[in-house]
Amino acid sequence: MNTQIIAIANQKGGVGKTTTCANLGVGLAQAGKKVLLIDGDPQGSLTISLGNPQPDKLPFTLSDAMGRILMDEPLRPGEGILHHPEGVDLMPADIQLSGMEVSLVNAMSRETILRQYLDTLKGQYSHILIDCQPSLGMLTVNALAAANRIIIPVQAEYLPAKGLEQLLSTVNKVKRQINPKLQIDGRKDFSWLSLYRQSVW
């Protein structure tokens, strides 16, 4: 199965990344696709929005999965993945993911830990969507290093548009140095419905 990995990123908060990720994922699932959502934000907003109000009480989250990869420890296929009634799977996140970002700073192959984890899942899903945190730290760089495409929700206003410069600079740097296959899939004023119509294939 050829897996499309899509990072949904913007270092500005409140632009609709989580809503885009959830609705696009459910829309793809309704179209018959096999979809995994990755919560890449230590705040766990995607995890909470999909019916898990206390992420810190979950037994296994993305920080655990990345920790296994980082320490070269065994990881059972699909371990920790939650199944949502609307047809999408979820790898949840909790506040421990912020500690993982600190651990990545001095790690070997630090930009590709998430990609190594997703490589264990690729054959199981047609689409993997990553909800990135509102920053350009190591977690977001990991998402960009793993993705085929990036969707950038942005409001059509001066300051949000101005903030795109730093994100696009990071995207171009990741593309040059780590992931030449990364493509920008969309920069548009947030409307999940139009985004869904233009992004489902």
What are these regions (language model features)?
Residues 1-201:
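P-loop NTP-binding core
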